[in-house]
């Protein structure tokens, strides 16, 4: 009987020990939505002539910071990107990220690329046009 009790106690303690040593892997960032305060026309966001600002809105889970980059259209333009802003999570319930960018050029034909940073990186892109 003593051996049986010892075996049960040992099994009970061993099962807790293995749970303690298991690694918890945080979920990677996930972009739920990425939009602007202007409507899309196909795959392009049409910026009205004379508009001076544009607001970018991102809803993302498992994300600490969102980086907002602007870069020209075309191939192999990643090295030409410019950081136009970032937003940092304010609390654990905060899944909304946004910036307002001041447009300082008369025309646009660019990509806005976002990176959601957390335990990994998620990416998304929208296209801007203004003639």
Where are these regions (language model features)?
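Sec-dependent N-terminal signal peptides
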Residues: 4-13
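Short, compositionally biased P/S/T/A/G/V-rich stretches that sit at domain boundaries
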Residues: 21-49
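Aromatic/hydrophobic beta-strand junction motif of beta-rich domains
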Residues: 54-60
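Beta-strand signatures of extracellular beta-sandwich domains
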Residues: 67-71
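Aromatic sugar-binding surface patches on proteins
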Residues: 89-100
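Surface-exposed, short loops/turns at beta-strand junctions within beta-sandwich domains
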Residues: 100-109
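Conserved structural position at the C-terminal beta-strand
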Residues: 116-118
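Edge beta-strands of extracellular beta-sandwich domains
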Residues: 122-131
């Amino acid at each position: 009987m003593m051996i049986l009790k010892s075996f049960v106690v040992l099994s009970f303690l061993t099962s807790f020990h293995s749970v303690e040593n298991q690694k918890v892997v945080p979920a990677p960032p996930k972009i739920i939505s990425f939009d602007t305060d202007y409507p899309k026309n196909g795959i392009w966001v049409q910026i009205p002539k004379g508009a001076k600002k544009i607001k970018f809105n991102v809803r993302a889970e498992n994300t600490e910071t969102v980086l907002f980059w602007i870069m020209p259209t075309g191939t192999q333009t990643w090295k030409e990107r410019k950081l136009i802003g970032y937003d940092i999570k304010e609390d654990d319930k905060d899944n909304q990220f946004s910036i307002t960018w001041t447009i300082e050029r008369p025309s646009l034909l660019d990509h806005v690329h976002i990176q959601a940073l957390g335990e990994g990186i998620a990416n998304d892109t929208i296209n801007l046009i203004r003639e």
